[in-house]
Amino acid sequence: MLSSITTGLATGWRNLLAPDLAIDLGTANTRLYARGHGLIADEPTLIKIQPGTGAVEAVGARAARLSKLDRFAYAVSPLHAGVVADVEAASSLLKFFLSRAQRLGILRPRALACAPTDACEEEREALIEATRRAGASAVVVVPEPMAAAIGAGLDVSSPYAQMVVDIGDGVTDIAVIRSGALVTTSAVRTACSDLRHSVSQTIAFRYGALLFSEEAERLMRVVGASGDYERERLFLTQGTDMLTGEPMSICISSHDVVEAVEPPLEIIVNAILKAVRDLPSETSCEVIETGLCLTGGGAQLQGLSERLADATSLAVRVADDPMRAVINGACQMLKVGIATDIWNN
């Protein structure tokens, strides 16, 4: 009993001095959870660097706002296809968010960060390096689909295989989990950003207009993954005239959006279908029983779950909070990690 009291006191003091962190550094959004303090960041993964000086001008939501207010302001994501592409920019972005945790304590926090299953050693090291430069004293990297499955409420300790598909902004990550371990994994670096980019390119080519990113996102989500060419709908949206640079209104056909999203969407669906078909027979039988769970922003695409159910013949469900499944699961993994001291083990 004395041992448990001592452990509890030590954990409590650590939460005060240096709250440990769970990090979901995504291509589109970054989410940070501080042990004992809850979610301390849920903002766009954007950073605006001052031209010439290289100084950080804005981060996260503020960088996104500046981009909307000033068409010459240019904010970028330091991630590409789900992994860190610019360590320096990623560390500056994380440092801004980690400073909120360090205001809560006086020591450098430890961190648990999530990475796609297909991230190579160099890409994992880039994530670790960016997090350390940002102020973390130690970093451990965990697979995103495991965090997503836990955050979606799956019992990952079950002896029966369960499939989770996390469709983020930069990568679609597919995994089968059994008895607390990843049995099979596969990933394709085609995801929501590719759908959005394809919509923007199609509208630019056919209408001579540059779509605002949020408008491309809205069209993508409203039209969804149904592939419906039969029923045409018209959408009034806002963009910028490519010739004059002036704001303009455009009436866009749903057929254009369907045609735009189909190629990247087909890559995603085919990757999931291949992962299902490649399962060993015993695992396949278990997944038929347990079904497929969708997480990530792509899980909210209208008609996607039905399309995947038709393609795979599996029961497909969308997690209750798909956008936050990874960070919610990472929070739970952090609690276990603190108890087992994963940074030293």
List each language-model region with its residue ranges:
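Nucleotide/phosphate-binding catalytic cleft detector across ATP-hydrolyzing
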Residues: 1-167, 175-292, 299-345
